[in-house]
Design a protein with these regions (language model features):
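N-terminal segment of the mature folded domain
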Residues: 62-117
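A conserved helix-loop-strand patch within extracytoplasmic ligand-binding domains
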Residues: 99-151
């Protein structure tokens, strides 16, 4: 975490080096996931305490944040947690136009799917395909609708779109898994509640993230990253994105930037 914090601060300083003054307020977008909110607050503290400026956090999803940055009217000037290639549909548009500049020092992020250690041991779950077993699906059905709940992310997340496709191409929908989109705070609460009640629950997870300190969870294995099996089209690129996408391997390590 110290390395990440140092990288973030260095990235922020280099990114803001072109700003002529901090007399005016710097508006930092907050896309709402736990890691992004933490980073946004860290960046705000750096601006306020180290750079003599004034920072304001502005909530919004990725589409709203990138749209505001692209308009260059001071509505939002910083995206605190850019995961690439997840968000490249936005960066590939804005960077060449000159309305978005990426920090020069990225750090790595790892994403996948998790269950609690308790649930993994109880049901002998180690890999993503284990979630397709009938007894596992049944154990993940908390509302009695016959579907096992699997949190894939929040509305507006590029990663949630990837996860929606992945679960399909891993055959989990056919096995009875139901993809759930909800705010990350809802997911965090559900993870803790499922452990307390001894229930099954699966969810999209990534590192770095606070969940690893909040609960005893394990990331499941997936087929190793295979570029031939990773063809993701985001809604911004094509309205028929879901049909045209095919993702059946683990994500490559991500480059995270400001």
């Amino acid at each position: 975490m110290k390395i990440i914090k140092t990288t973030l601060v260095a990235g922020l300083i280099s990114l803001f080096a072109t700003f002529s003054t901090f007399a005016e307020k710097v508006k930092i977008g907050d896309p709402g996931w736990t890691g992004a909110t933490a980073i946004a607050n860290l960046l705000a503290a750096v601006v306020n305490d180290k750079m003599g400026g004034e920072a304001e956090l502005v909530p919004g999803n990725n589409t709203a944040i990138y749209g505001a940055i692209d308009r260059s009217k001071g509505e939002i000037e910083v995206h605190p947690d850019i995961w690439l290639p997840n968000q490249q549909a936005y960066t590939n548009d804005l960077v060449p136009k000159g309305t978005l500049k990426l920090s020069s020092k990225p750090y790595e992020g790892n994403q996948g799917y998790c269950v609690s250690q308790q649930f993994a041991k109880k049901m002998n779950i180690t890999a993503i395909e284990d979630l397709a077993r009938p007894e596992v699906v049944k154990a993940m059905d908390s509302d009695g609708n016959g579907k096992g709940e699997f949190w894939i992310g929040a509305d507006g997340w590029a990663s949630a779109n990837v996860n929606q496709v992945k679960l399909r191409d891993y055959g989990l929908y056919d096995a009875g898994i139901e993809a759930i989109r909800a705010a990350e705070a809802v997911k965090n609460a559900r993870v803790l509640d499922s452990i307390k009640k001894g229930e099954g629950y699966a969810f999209y997870c990534y590192k770095p993230h606070a969940i690893w300190g909040m609960a005893d969870v394990v990331m499941l294995t997936e087929p190793k990253f295979d570029e031939a099996k990773y063809k993701m089209v985001q809604p911004k690129e094509d309205a028929d994105w879901y049909k045209k996408s095919y993702v059946a391997s683990k994500d490559a390590l991500k480059q995270i930037q400001i």
